[in-house]
């Protein structure tokens, strides 16, 4: 698999299945996007490469959620997912390739669009969004950077990394999206309807198409968030009156009064234009929802995809709903995914180029279990199969193969191969440790344990020596434990350290030498931390002001994400960036607001106690984060600069005038604001950042705020670029 370059030297060509990797198309938070060319048909695709080793489990779960959501959506204006490949280190998403670039760059080049062209783009966006909402999917990160154009200048909605399934009348909690396009309820940290949040974002996009500027803009992040919450913006006179009423209905602070997609599609400006073609609509598909008699009739691949969506985390409840006789949301989503699987079966590639790689990417293929009618399909001669545990829980195909290979390697070392088959299908069933089914990287708590089963004669099958047995010889168990700490599990060569159970600890160290257990090197990494709390007392402030200050403090700290638990409780997570991975353990803590003193009449301005409780993570880093939040809570005037909380000094880039275009939109806002606050504190005049080369200062979308790696965890902001100053100052005047 080599090709000769001009200098006569051999250059290795990289392949993902039948696709040859070529130039890099872009770079995001989760990895690179490269151009792929099919070795036979020359079809071009975009291959998103996700490095599993460099991303946290929560981010990888979001990648799996994006895969499941893209399987649910088939629309001409939504980017298509073709296939998924994977090996031990990388995950490869084979996506539709569109050559027109981003709508953002199109706006930078052309300036504000004519109402006719803006209506064409807007109709396509609304058509695709309406299809997503009809399948209970909310995008939550709509902006021109995530809207791509094909060769005919038609819209493709991309980047569903922040998308969520909103079932029924439930509300969402995660604060995500870009500040210029986020609705007020998201900015305030309240629970919100994802569908209404998408409508607000579409209103901001339509304004940008028609004006070439954003309705809410400010160099100061705090001022920007305040403008969004007020919802007051300047409406240029050149916007048609009908369109002005549509914009005011979409960019409405009160979510209850905000227009719905149904009202938008009936609006006179949306319908207008007699000679304009209607947006292309997908062929409606009627999926029959039928009853599922038993667990054996449930397709394991579809079950995996549903669990990856994130809203069906309770596996037992999901199975109960699927087996119910009544029609419900779970069954509708199940049969939609099953219908997609039957129409686009994922099978092994037939013609692959010759490869000499040690661990080539393998295609995710359908398990040979059930078809849509509950009957077993004939098995393919493929190693990519699905193993099922005793409890009925499916194990991913790659995991099952490597478990079997690990068992073979162990037997070849010990010579105990008489009672075990070498086939991954006929080997003893494997009981994996519980892990989120939606995660592509389930973290094992140890080497997989092959559960011995009684043979018909009554003699148990031998247990592979690689599996530490509680009843085994202590020194052998200790030796195996040391060996596994170097080798890792069959799938992962670097395991996360887990707190061992007392039973495991007793096997790690012989009983005759308790001193070794006390001085074990595990103690340097595993600490059973006691609950640590920090209290902050606040006087003469109403509860609403305290909550707003806490949310603003969260938003002003890079790499900190939060979610709302109740009216007076938040949960936050801070992830340090840079430095060795061993020092990047996230800090998780809870914030509770309690009323401590004063009568009911004084409750509005009484004494409140804000309690910060450390849930997990380093205590010192927790205290530094709380100190930063505390300084902002107790400040009555200008907020202090957000401190640099990382343990390394190379994480923060000061204003250089060359702000990167990729990464999270908020993180570089934070970097700039930190410098601005610092300058103000020292009595200096704060200077705005320089204009990036790509955003011409003379164009209607001249300046832009940079994007960097976004905060992680549940309240993570997505990868992408953000717009800061879209348009000349005259177009950004705010109404008094």
From Swiss-Prot:
Its main location: cytoplasm. Serine/threonine-protein kinase that plays a key role in polarization of neurons and axonogenesis, cell cycle progress and insulin secretion. Phosphorylates CDK16, CDC25C, MAPT/TAU, PAK1 and WEE1. Following phosphorylation and activation by STK11/LKB1, acts as a key regulator of polarization of cortical neurons, probably by mediating phosphorylation of microtubule-associated proteins such as MAPT/TAU at 'Thr-529' and 'Ser-579'. The modification Phosphothreonine is found at residues 174, 260, 459, 463, 509. Changing residue 260 to A: Decreased phosphorylation. Nearly abolishes stimulation of insulin secretion. It catalyses: L-seryl-[protein] + ATP = O-phospho-L-seryl-[protein] + ADP + H(+); L-threonyl-[protein] + ATP = O-phospho-L-threonyl-[protein] + ADP + H(+); L-seryl-[tau protein] + ATP = O-phospho-L-seryl-[tau protein] + ADP + H(+); L-threonyl-[tau protein] + ATP = O-phospho-L-threonyl-[tau protein] + ADP + H(+). A motif (KEN box) lies at residues 603-605. Changing residue 48 to M: Loss of catalytic activity. Causes disintegration of actin stress fibers. ATP binds at residues 25-33, 48. This is Serine/threonine-protein kinase BRSK2. The KEN box motif is required for interaction with FZR1/CDH1 and essential for APC(CDH1)-mediated ubiquitination. Changing residue 174 to E: Constitutively activated. GO terms for cellular component: centrosome; cytoplasm; distal axon; endoplasmic reticulum; perinuclear region of cytoplasm. Detected in pancreas islets (at protein level).
